[in-house]
Structure formats: structure tokens, C-alpha cells
Amino acid sequence: MLTLFLLTVLIYHRCFRRYDADPEPELGLPAKRLTFLSGPNRLQGYLCGTGDTLAVLAPGLGNGAFSYAPQIQWLAEAGLRVFSFDYTGCYGSTGRSCRGFPQAADDLRAALRFLEENGRFGSRRLVLLGHSMGGYAVCCALPGSRVDAAVCIGGGNSPME
């Protein structure tokens, strides 16, 4: 039993380690760097584009704010304002490790609070986009939020599954 526990701990720490890019991918369009808190950690985010709709992109495990640069660029060119961010323990954010799926949900909720506190940077509508771990975070963030639409790609049907 102890062996299984230790093996589980080892696998967990390997999967949910700190993720860094070398070098960080380029976005290809102007982006404003923003920081906000999620618990004790300072997270780094980027806001680009203009428009009445704000799309918040929650990346998958091991990815950062610019890992979806082609999609961000396409959304911005289509007239959306896009906010993407690095999770705890990933890329430009602080933290020793990404800490797993529950932390991603906490980080997305912190990002949404930050955006609401800043008037969504002038946007009236809010759309959440999540892939993999980010899709899970989107499902977790929906209850009680003021989201107009959500796209969850490979993230689970609910936070309980």
C-alpha cells in the first residue's frame, strides 16, 4: 500500500510540475501584460484586441498564455478582445508547480474576478474558452459567473466528472 501511495505521489509531481517555455512563444500582435493574484501567487496575463466581446482563454496542462497564439490572433482579428493567462506555476506566473486541475479552476476564477474588478476592460459580453485542463476550469467557473457563452474542448462534462 505504501508503494502505491509513493508511486502516486511521484506521478502527480511529474505531471503537475512547474512548466516553463524556452523561449516563450510570440503572439504576433500587440498585447498588454497584466498581473493579478490567485491566492498567494501572482499570475501573468495578456490582453489583446478590441471589441465588445471579451474571450478568456484557459489553456491546457503545460501550456501558457501564448501557447494558442494562432487562435488568439484569429479571435482578435475577428473583432474580439482576448485575455489569456499563465496558471500558477506556469511560464510567467509564480508558484513552484501548477498543482493540478483544481488549481486551474481557482486560477480561472481569480482571472474572472480580476476582469470584473476592471470592468472587463470595456467589453460587454464574456466568453470562456478552455482546452483540456482549461476546459475543466471553464466547467468549474460557470456556476455563479456572469458568462454569456462557453466553449469547452476536451475538458469534461462537469467539475464532478
What is the predicted function of each stretch?
Residues 61-74, 87:
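The serine-hydrolase catalytic nucleophile loop
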Residues 130-140:
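Glycine-rich nucleophile elbow surrounding the catalytic serine of serine-hydrolase chemistry
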Residues 1-37, 43-46:
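An N-terminal hydrophobic leader/cap segment in hydrolases
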Residues 86-101:
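Glycine-rich "HGGG/HGxG" loop immediately N-terminal to the catalytic nucleophile
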Residues 98-119:
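Alpha/beta-hydrolase active-site loop
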Residues 139-161:
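Hydrolase active-site cap/lid region
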Residues 52-60:
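Short beta-strand element of the alpha/beta-hydrolase
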Residues 120-132:
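Alpha/beta-hydrolase fold nucleophile elbow
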